[in-house]
């Protein structure tokens, strides 16, 4: 996500922290090597430039977001030419009683226990050894979640990348190949010195990672879903390398487009745990529904989901171009949406620093995001899309 002013946070690197951390040597990036350390980025429609990796981080420190489209340049792929999929979303919620019963099983304690471990990895930087190890641990948790359910056909797979950290895709097959996707990004970053400094990434995006995992666990308690009786297939994605220009999610949706996958919707959950900004501004707790660079029909349906399934309301807000992984789905023609923890200006200023820790999070607020995720996925799994 965006980057706060480091100086205002008083984030100064100590001499002990600046020392190289064992097992943090960056893992090679073959795409970077081809272009002698240069990357092609897109900061807006048609606004592209070649930059070094340090220039990428400099742009991020200045609050600029972008797609890293180096792979597109290599493959002569032009996603802006892809037709946008048109989907008619439901006008009303159809499963209120059943979903609310399921939602009673969502657990704040599980969210906190998961995040305490997930943030203990020194960094989840996508080219670090600890970033690879965190992905391995996350994969094991997802695998365990599926194994403990009755969903015998559900599966989890690694989506490999040229860098060290893989993306993860969990699939619950339905009656058709029409697919409903929920995503979060698993990587973290300290933008001061990405390959050296700690990046616990509790809110960005440990919170989203935990939120959708908990939603998956409870969704699998539905016998109809677990036994593959839903009309539509459901997927949960945990992307690598979001912080470096949406690299992991771009690779996933590029592959899906190549394979003619029928993705009907994609919801991104990035930063779901920080409520202090809203409270300190004197406003009631709420979730932030993004309205720019998203699918209008899906976004309007999400408003209904929040109203029907959450104990708090929503505010409308904007986050700009390429601000999280939903943008990759949209880039390849799939309807996408994004729900964040608050109005954008009230979101956490601790992200991308050593201070993005579990202690800053509101697990009651995260539970609301889990309810929204569960409600949306269940409704769309059984919808005529």
Swiss-Prot record:
Protein name as annotated: Leucine aminopeptidase 1
Glycoprotein in keyword set: yes
Sequence positions that bind Zn(2+) 2: 204, 243, 352
Record localization: Secreted
Function description: Extracellular aminopeptidase that allows assimilation of proteinaceous substrates.
Glycosylation sites: 177
Record GO biological process: proteolysis
InterPro entries noted in UniProt: M28_fam, Peptidase_M28
Domain of life assignment: Eukaryota
Prodomain residues: 20-87
Disulfide bonds: 319-323
Major subcellular site: secreted
Residues annotated as binding Zn(2+) 1: 185, 204, 270
Subunit structure: Monomer.
Keyword set, alphabetical order: Aminopeptidase, Disulfide bond, Glycoprotein, Hydrolase, Metal-binding, Protease, Secreted, Signal, Zinc, Zymogen
Organism placement in taxonomy: Eukaryota, Fungi, Dikarya, Ascomycota, Pezizomycotina
Similarity section: Belongs to the peptidase M28 family. M28E subfamily.
Signal peptide start and end residues: 1-19
Any one GO molecular function term: aminopeptidase activity
The protein's required cofactors: Zn(2+)
Keyword Zinc: yes
Top enzyme class: hydrolase
């Amino acid at each position: 996500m965006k980057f706060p002013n480091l100086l205002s946070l008083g984030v100064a690197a100590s001499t002990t922290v600046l020392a190289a951390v064992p097992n943090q040597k960056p893992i090679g990036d073959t795409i970077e090597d081809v272009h002698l350390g240069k990357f092609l980025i897109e900061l807006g429609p048609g606004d592209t430039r070649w930059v070094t990796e340090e220039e990428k981080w400099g742009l991020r420190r200045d609050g600029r977001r972008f797609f890293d489209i180096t792979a597109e340049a290599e493959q002569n792929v032009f996603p802006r030419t892809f037709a946008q999929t048109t989907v008619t979303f439901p006008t009303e919620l159809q499963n209120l009683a059943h979903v609310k019963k399921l939602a009673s099983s969502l657990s704040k304690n599980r969210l906190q226990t998961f995040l305490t471990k997930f943030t203990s990895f020194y960094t989840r930087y996508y080219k670090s050894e600890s970033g690879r190890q965190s992905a391995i641990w996350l994969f094991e948790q997802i695998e365990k979640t599926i194994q403990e359910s009755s969903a015998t056909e559900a599966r989890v797979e690694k989506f490999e990348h040229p860098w060290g950290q893989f993306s993860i895709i969990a699939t619950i097959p339905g009656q058709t190949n029409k697919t409903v996707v929920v995503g979060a990004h698993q990587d973290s970053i300290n933008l001061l010195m990405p390959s050296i400094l700690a990046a616990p990434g509790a809110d960005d995006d440990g919170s989203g990672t935990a939120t959708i995992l908990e939603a998956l666990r409870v969704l699998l308690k539905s016998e109809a879903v677990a036994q593959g009786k839903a009309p539509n297939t459901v997927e949960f994605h945990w992307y690598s390398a979001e912080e470096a220009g949406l690299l992991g999610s771009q690779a996933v949706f590029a592959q899906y487009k190549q394979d003619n996958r029928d993705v009907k919707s994609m919801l991104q959950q990035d930063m779901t745990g920080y409520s202090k900004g809203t409270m300190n501004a004197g406003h009631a707790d709420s979730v932030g529904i993004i309205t720019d660079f998203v699918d209008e029909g899906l976004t309007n349906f999400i408003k209904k989901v929040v109203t029907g399934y959450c104990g708090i309301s929503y505010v409308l807000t904007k986050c700009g171009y390429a601000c999280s992984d939903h943008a990759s789905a949209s880039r390849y023609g799939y309807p996408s949406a994004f729900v964040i923890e608050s109005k954008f200006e009230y979101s956490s200023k601790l992200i991308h620093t050593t201070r993005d820790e579990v202690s800053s999070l509101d697990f009651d607020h995260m539970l609301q995001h889990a309810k929204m995720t569960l409600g949306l996925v269940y409704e769309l799994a059984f919808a005529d899309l």
